[in-house]
Amino acid sequence: MDTIDLRDRIIGRAKDFGADDAGVCLASDLLEGPTHRKFPLPEGVENYHSILVVALKHPGDKPDLDYFIKRDGARFGNSEGNRRLMDISDRIGRWLTEEGITSRDLHYYVERGGVFLKGAAVLAGLGSIGVNNLLIHPGFGPRIRFRAHLVDAPLTPSVPLDFEPCMDCQRPCLNVCPEEALDHTGYLTGRCQVRLDRNAAEAVILPAEEDKPAARESHCCRKCELSCSYTGTFEIAGRQ
């Protein structure tokens, strides 16, 4: 099968499985970039050619998709949105296996074997990085989340977008951060982390249920994301 046709078929299946968008980049293009020089590469990644990036929109009227829940006794927590992305990735993996193609899901966190998802999404033609350091999708703005899946097939990569959503914007996102982590000079990771740590400390306690232990539910700050005024009107020629 032609590498473009196979790419488009895989993207189509990702959408069938629940993704709101998807794209493909070359593993070498992402992993040879400056950000990944600071972290070990995911184990065995050199055996794979392509990275499928799947996207799931997280609209402002569905905040529960982003609530981070950690059950008592659990080693890790998760959000409903990421659980859905994991399910999409798992279904893609099973389908690719049936097609005779080796693949594997990548962890969300870089330090646990993942990749930089915003960088992967840009290379996969899913958006551009805004002045708020968020990935802005042409249809959904910054209210979107991603997951990556390694594919051992020589897929033709998606084309990165010529898309500048912040060009004519008044940039309200730069003025809403309670920790002043954003300004016209860039993004201050440490200040943002202060707010995220506070969100975790102020987690809502969920009582135990018949089949589930008690849990802590963190509502992470999304002020910069939800204040973004991009309306999602950028049209992409040929997008499925």
Which residues are covered by each model-predicted region?
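Non-catalytic, usually N-terminal nucleic-acid engagement modules in DNA/RNA processing proteins
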Residues: 1-77
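Catalytic cores of enzyme domains
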Residues: 33-34, 41, 70-240
